[in-house]
C-alpha cells in the first residue's frame, strides 16, 4: 500500500509520539491498537485528503468486485478500460504498462530508457525504490543517496559492476547536473518533478532543455 515498508519507519516517525500500527481508519482519522484517535497528516494524507479512508462508495465497489471474483486466469476488462482512458488523457503515448509497485515501475522505465539510448549512464535525483540500478549510486560512497529521502541504503548484494553507472544530483542544483552530463556520458535523467521543495530559477525548464 501507500504506507511503504515498516523498515522505513525509524527514518520518518518519532518513537513514542506516533504509533506503529493502526486498528481502524476512516476519513482523515486513524486509531491505534489502544483505540486512541489521530488525525493523519502523514504519508497517506495526500490520499485521505482527496477521498478519505474507508470511503463508502469505494468500499461498495471493492466489495462488489470481490463478490464477482477479483482474480482469474484471464485479464479483467477494467485493465483494458483504464489503459484506454490513460492513452486518451495522454495521446502522446500509444501503449500502457502496469506495475505492482513504484520500484518496479521505475525499473521498467529505466530498462526502456536504456534500451533506447546510446549512453546508458543515469543522473538521478530523489527516491526511486530499492532496485539494483538505483542503489548502485551508493557503491562508490554509501552516503551518496543520504539526501534523497532515506539515509544509509545498503548496497550488499548489488553487483559491483554497476558502480559508476548512476550518479546522484540534488534538486535545484542544475550546475551539478549539467557537469555530470558532460563528464559521465549521461544518457538518462531520472528525477521527481517535485517533492517538498519548489523548483527555483527555471530548474525544470532547464532540465527539460538539457
Indicate residue ranges for each PLM-predicted region:
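Active-site-adjacent loop/helix segments that line or gate small-molecule/cofactor pockets in enzymes
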Residues: 1-24
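Short beta-strands and strand-loop turn motifs
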Residues: 40-43, 187-194
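Active-site and channel-lining beta-strand-loop segments
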Residues: 19-41
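PLP-dependent aspartate aminotransferase-fold enzymes
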Residues: 81-187
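Adenylate-forming
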Residues: 6-7, 48-50, 132-137
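Alpha-helix capping and helix-loop boundary segments enriched in small/acidic/polar residues
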Residues: 73-74, 100, 168, 195-198
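Glycine-rich loop-to-alpha-helix module at the N-terminal edge of alpha/beta enzyme cores
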Residues: 37-119
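Active-site core of PLP-dependent enzymes with the aminotransferase class I/II
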Residues: 173-179, 191-210
Amino acid at each position: 500500500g501507500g504506507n511503504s515498508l515498516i523498515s522505513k519507519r525509524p527514518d520518518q516517525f518519532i518513537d513514542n509520539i506516533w504509533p506503529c500500527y493502526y486498528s481502524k481508519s476512516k476519513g482523515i482519522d486513524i486509531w491505534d491498537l489502544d483505540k486512541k484517535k489521530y488525525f493523519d497528516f502523514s504519508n497517506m494524507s495526500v490520499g485521505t485528503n482527496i477521498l478519505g479512508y474507508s470511503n463508502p462508495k469505494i468500499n461498495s465497489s471493492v466489495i462488489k468486485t470481490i463478490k464477482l471474483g477479483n482474480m482469474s486466469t484471464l485479464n479483467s476488462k477494467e485493465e483494458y478500460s483504464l489503459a484506454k482512458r490513460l492513452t486518451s488523457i495522454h495521446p502522446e503515448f500509444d501503449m500502457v504498462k502496469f506495475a505492482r509497485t513504484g520500484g518496479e515501475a521505475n525499473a521498467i522505465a529505466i530498462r526502456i530508457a536504456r534500451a533506447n539510448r546510446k549512453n546508458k549512464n543515469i543522473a538521478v535525483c530523489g527516491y526511486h525504490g530499492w532496485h539494483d540500478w538505483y542503489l548502485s549510486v551508493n557503491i562508490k560512497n554509501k552516503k551518496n543517496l543520504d539526501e534523497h529521502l532515506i539515509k544509509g541504503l545498503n548496497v550488499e548484494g548489488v553487483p559491483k559492476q554497476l558502480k559508476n553507472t548512476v550518479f546522484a544530483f540534488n534538486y535545484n542544483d542544475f550546475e551539478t547536473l549539467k557537469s555530470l552530463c558532460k563528464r559521465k556520458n549521461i544518457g538518462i535523467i531520472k528525477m521527481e518533478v517535485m517533492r517538498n521543495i519548489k523548483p527555483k530559477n527555471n530548474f525544470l525548464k532547464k532540465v527539460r532543455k538539457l
